[in-house]
């Protein structure tokens, strides 16, 4: 694999080419989506769709453990590190850690990043989220202090996607509609959730493994505002449905989270609820059967 300075790396030209294996896996990581009790404080029951209404969802899914044997409320840094490495980050630290990974978790990601492991086994992989120009203005050292997904991608020495890639529909921004970018003054097209889902589907055929991260769920959950939470769930529902309608045959798609949040309007914090593991495509039954917690 060609190595260039991180500040010069762009994903649009480096990550193209045919997939060398027939099997493809896509992981849609949704921050802060737990399996609630279905009560009046649970917007997954009232948002107007059924994909994330666990009592009515026709998707193949099961709850998995996000606590990993550690007491307290699960948090982002440890949950995501466990998810992206397959190792129990909570047990390594002895507690749940919020925000971005600290030195110990960064080292775990540096050594055991799923993306890095795939590359070492001659598989193609991509973290398909588009990044704002500010990312390339940061020093390399600063980039290593960002989110677990960013560190996992850095550990694999994979390129990052730009807003030019977004405009060319080679990547998707984290909010899927580009509304956040437009409010910041960037000249990017406004997308519907359905259009963004179809863009993701068109691109996953280029890689053996694709990661996409959506975190508006966690932000909405912290507001405890029903209207905001229901709107985000509607958006995510439309995005995932459109993606599933357009995804290439032979693709196994997984959707999961790092901890609960949006499913309980009664608290501003995260929850101790299990998180969903949803699966579509060849091998979905085996994938669900093999997973009991974030490390699986």
Name each model feature, range by range:
Residues 2-296:
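Feature captures the catalytic ectodomains and active-site-proximal regions of enzymes
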């Amino acid at each position: 694999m060609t190595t260039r300075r991180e500040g010069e790396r762009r994903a649009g030209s480096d990550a193209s080419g045919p997939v060398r294996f027939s099997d493809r896996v896509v992981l849609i990581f949704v921050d802060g989506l737990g399996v609630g009790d279905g009560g009046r404080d649970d917007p997954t029951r009232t948002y107007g769709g059924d994909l994330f209404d666990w009592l009515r969802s026709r998707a193949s899914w099961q709850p998995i453990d996000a606590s990993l044997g550690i007491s307290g409320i699960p948090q982002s840094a440890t949950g995501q590190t466990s998810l992206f490495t397959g190792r129990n980050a909570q047990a390594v630290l002895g507690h749940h850690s919020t925000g971005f990974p600290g030195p110990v978790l960064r080292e775990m990601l540096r050594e055991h990043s799923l993306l890095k492991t795939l590359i070492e086994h001659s598989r193609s992989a991509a973290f398909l989220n588009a990044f704002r120009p500010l990312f390339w203005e940061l020093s390399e050292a600063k980039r290593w202090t960002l989110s677990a997904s960013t560190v996992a991608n850095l550990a694999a020495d994979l390129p990052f996607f730009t807003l030019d890639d977004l405009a060319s529909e080679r990547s998707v921004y984290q909010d899927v509609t580009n509304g956040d970018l437009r409010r910041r003054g960037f000249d990017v097209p406004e997308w519907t959730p359905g259009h963004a889902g179809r863009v993701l589907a068109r691109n996953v055929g280029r890689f053996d493994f694709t990661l996409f991260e959506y975190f508006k769920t966690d932000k909405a959950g912290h507001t405890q505002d029903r209207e905001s939470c229901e709107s985000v769930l509607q958006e995510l529902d439309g995005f995932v449905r459109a993606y599933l309608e357009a995804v290439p045959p032979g693709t196994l798609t997984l959707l999961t989270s790092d901890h609960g949040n949006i499913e309980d309007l009664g608290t501003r914090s995260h929850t101790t609820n299990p998180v969903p593991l949803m699966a579509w495509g060849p091998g979905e039954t085996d994938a669900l059967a093999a997973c009991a917690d974030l490390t699986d």
